[in-house]
Design a protein with these regions (language model features):
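Conserved alpha/beta-hydrolase "acid-adjacent" motif
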Residues: 145-150
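Conserved small/polar residues in nucleotide/adenosyl-binding loops
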Residues: 175-181
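Catalytic histidine neighborhood in serine/cysteine hydrolases
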Residues: 159-174
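Catalytic nucleophile-loop/oxyanion-hole region of alpha/beta-hydrolase
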Residues: 8-44
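Primarily recognizes the serine-hydrolase "nucleophile elbow" in alpha/beta-hydrolase
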Residues: 35-100
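Short beta-strand/loop motif that positions the catalytic acidic residue
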Residues: 137-139
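Short amphipathic alpha-helix adjacent to the substrate-entry channel of hydrolases
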Residues: 1-8
């Protein structure tokens, strides 16, 4: 923070809430930061989302869906107000296909989980476009919860659209890898 970084934690709705509530909450938060950037000394060209696991799906969802009319219309803002400038996706849930973390999609979609079109819409490797922001991905190859293929699929989709992307793959996964207690 001493170097000018700001960190904001969003406590978004989870089960029993369903799509698109958490997405709208995240979009509203980004719009709030943009609207109040001067007060909070935020560079509006550097609003970067970070999400882990299912939170990675949420962050990536705003990255691929920010231009969808329903978001701006629901929130009463322009699409540019909710656009992330970049994403850091940490072992993200991406695909509802072969390498899915099924529980995440069941929670996200609820009764709509069996609707294959809705599941495919939430399979974010199919939603990447030229408007998806720069992305940093990291994952562990041996992740036994969210398969590494989730990051690989998103990486390949970003490459198809020539979106700047960097990915780090680590060979071994540890429980609670992102917690500082692993260093003790």
């Amino acid at each position: 923070l001493v170097r000018g970084y700001h960190a904001v934690i969003l406590r978004y709705s989870v089960e029993p809430a369903r799509y698109p509530l958490a997405l709208l909450q995240l979009a509203k938060s980004v719009a709030f930061l943009r609207k109040n950037a001067a007060e909070f000394h935020i560079d509006t060209n550097k609003i970067v989302l970070q999400g882990f696991s299912a939170g990675g799906h949420l962050a990536a969802s705003l990255g691929v869906f920010w231009k969808k009319d329903f978001i701006a219309q629901t929130l009463g803002v322009t699409s540019d107000m909710v656009k992330p400038n970049g994403m850091i996706l940490s072992y993200p849930v991406i695909t509802s296909g072969e390498f899915a973390h099924t529980g995440s999609f069941e929670c996200l979609l609820g009764e709509d989980y069996n609707d294959l079109d809705k599941r495919k819409e939430q399979s974010l490797e199919f939603q990447v476009s030229k408007d998806t922001p720069t992305t940093f991905l990291w994952h562990t190859v041996t992740d036994d919860c969210v398969p590494v293929e989730n990051s690989l699929l998103f990486f390949n989709a970003l490459r198809k659209f020539e979106i700047p992307v960097e990915m780090h793959l680590y060979p071994v996964s540890y429980t609670h890898l992102t917690l500082p207690t692993i260093l003790r």
